[in-house]
Amino acid sequence: MYRSYSLLILFSLFNCLSAESQFTATDWPNWRGLTSDGQAKLVDGLPTEWSQTKNVVWKTFIPGRGHSTPTLVGNHIYLATADEDEMFQSVVCLNKLDGKMIWQTKVHEGQFAVGLNKHASHAGTTVVHDGERLYVNFVIGSQAYASALGLDGKLIWQKPIGKYKVHQGYGSSPMVFGNIVVVKADTKIGGAICGLDKKTGREIWRQERPKFPNYTTPVVIESAGKQQMVFCGCELITSLDPLTGAKLWEVSGSTQECVSTLVTDGTHIFVSGGWPKNHTAAIVADGSGRVAWKNSARVYVPSMLIRDDFLYVTMDAGFAICWNAKTGEEQWKERLGGAFYTSPVMVGNRIYGSNLSGKTFVFEANPNEFKLIAANQLGNEVYASPIVSGDRLYLRVAFKGDERKEFLYAIGKN
């Protein structure tokens, strides 16, 4: 039994490393990118300025509505979307080179969940690519589901995660580790986090969760000499073994509702949430529960970025701020304007962050001073976070008017 369990762990770790090796530095296979921290490799030629006509390689109409961030692997882009008139949720696949749609697969049809916040959508999670399959989470009616699709768009399996009562919406994306896809659905009627077999959807492990709504996506970090899957929310910061679901440690220290995904410097994890209280903190990632520092800044929806011992944040209320990651000391704070429901991306020493009204700010990751490089307007509503691949930036934006329409733009020098 022990030998079989050990072989399972070794095999899963091998497959995890093999899957990562399938991707290149220009791939963006899951929420927050290849390294799950919102950072991309700097490539010469990535624009800092654009408009509806300037530096637009292509734009493509995206049917329906969604906050799903683009997923990009090789020459293909994947998005989740929801048609609120026809009542179906789907995944679309586009050609990266010209933006043309290759396929669209209906994943769910039927009565949508009720009670969404006006800033939420019925396609709020990001598609995950593991090199062989696609994984996506949706809530339909009163049930949360995880689904797997082939790269040709054909549905492979579908698994109910559990009953789901909408409070704000649903935004926890799948996470892949080894042979397991992890899915989470925190809800005020009692949720769960599960490890499913990637090939079949069979449940391998399950942990019941507190009766609180929460929207975070787990990430795997290496700390204290082990791989830990860490996430916050439900008034807890939790670390699980991603292969077995075993609880490594869990401490109080978060607020109930968190949307942002935590980041780490290897020894600390940086968490934030925004309801019913604002909470941002640096926690020592050893299970001790020791808080290195904390403050009451509202970083509810946007996720943080970390570079060279400094944290960079686009706050919900429209400020950019830089903190010393070791001490929490504020380096600078600057008003950008508008509200932010997206997470910024970092490319080298540049940060790209889009506000709700469609303006994307480009500024330096510089702890000594705030320096704005450019501010670019595209569309008039943005909920999906930008991604970067090579010398192109991809923006999912909406134009509101008599008829609201969404588009995906490929921004590159032309």
Language-model-detected regions and their locations in the chain:
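Bacterial N-terminal signal peptides
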Residues: 6-16
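Noncatalytic, solvent-exposed loop/strand surfaces
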Residues: 19-414
